[in-house]
Amino acid sequence: MSVFSVVMLLQVAAASPLPPQDSTLPLDERIDRSKVTEQPPPVVASVSARPPSVVRRVSLAAAEVPCAASSWHAARASINQGLEFLRARQDAGGGWRVWKGSAGTDQRDRSLAASTAITALALKAFAQVGELPMNSPTAARARDSIRSRVGGTGRAFNPDPQGGLGNYVASAIASALASIEDPEDRVLLRSSVEWLTMHQWDQTEGVSPRMDWFGGAGYGRSGRPDLSNTQMMLDALHDAGVSADDPAVRRALVFLTRTQNLAETNAAPWASGGSRDGGFVYTPANGGESFASEAAGEGRFGEKIAVGQPRSLRSYGSMTYAGFKSMLYAGLSKDDPRVQAAFEWIRRHWTFRENPGLGAQGHFYYLHAVSRALHAAQQHTITDVQGSAHNWRDELIAALLSMQASDGSWVNSASRWDEGDSELCTIYAVLALEEAIKPAQEAAPVNSPAAP
């Protein structure tokens, strides 16, 4: 472990302790109390397994990765092509997608801060192959761009002055700076981690552990937490070296448990009345939402389900891999029923051709989540429910290479969530390939609930 990592572990791993539950605290004005559901908080055991180690660089040799040597070489070449595409698209000020705002789910206004998050993700993509600010003008300009936007010397850290995308921006910055491991960044890294833990929904906003918002992260102005924002936060905390025992991670595990389609551990009515398939939905907040339910014609809230049928929500790919990965980062054992149920869902819906439940929508976001999740699971081969064994690295690399354009870029024909933009999709694809060729560690397999 580097000196930088040790310093950051000491500085950011001990976040503020869990505040005592206090019913006298007023509920935050952004929350519509009439929409919040309450159940007894799920049981969140202490950390039962060592979370996967943070790996910050791709492997230097094919022998370090459990995939075909040809796949490793193809991935390295593909990554280089993608990075050259991004290098050519970098703005003179060091950023990507500058002046192209984005709006989060249900956000009315587009925020220009999206460029800061995307620039941070691109910086991480360059850093993971060894292009760092001290040896790469591209990386140096990207870091300077980030510093200038979120608070330089004498200014408070503010990831999104417009308010909507702060969690995404702060998370991307934390992950990027952690990947660089430069002591010069320790103040900004600490600020981004502190911002994330301060803006998590908990008792300080009058949200008790009984409420379906508790432990999640969301968009700043609309407030309502969701799994996409929460997994970004947990990625950042993991990358920055924050302990799985940290109160922020334990709070997030409450939210994760409530987002899973698993009645044994989730008391929400939509989980009890649904498939109980172990997958994950978009959010449990305000009674629950799922984009897969929307895609199936049942309404995002399950409000279009036929009269007389119990309300339920459909699980889908990107959120299931996000939840699975996040539970591993939170220190859940692979024998935990929540982890096993999520893994069983993955085995039943094995594909890289689409985002299961949403088709082409969010496909590259999905592939990035898949790659991080399966690297975190530390399993080289996944056996699907039909009994077919899959080397996920070989298959993921082949899938991404088949979609790469001749100029080194990737783009999604389904433009939802900004995936019609080649810069964003290329960043997702490069990050996914980099996860696939990071050095692997051996670990015990995840057993499905039905396994002997």
What is each residue range found by the language model?
Residues 1-21:
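Sec-dependent N-terminal signal peptides
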Residues 25-84, 98-138, 152-194, 198-254, ...:
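An alpha-helical repeat/solenoid feature that recognizes helix-turn-helix modules
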Residues 90, 150:
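Conserved hydrophobic residues forming the short capping helix/wall of the S-adenosyl-L-methionine
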Residues 119, 143-149:
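Active-site-surrounding "flap" and adjacent substrate/cofactor-binding loops of secreted or lumenal enzymes
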Residues 449-452:
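Short, solvent-exposed mixed-charge patches
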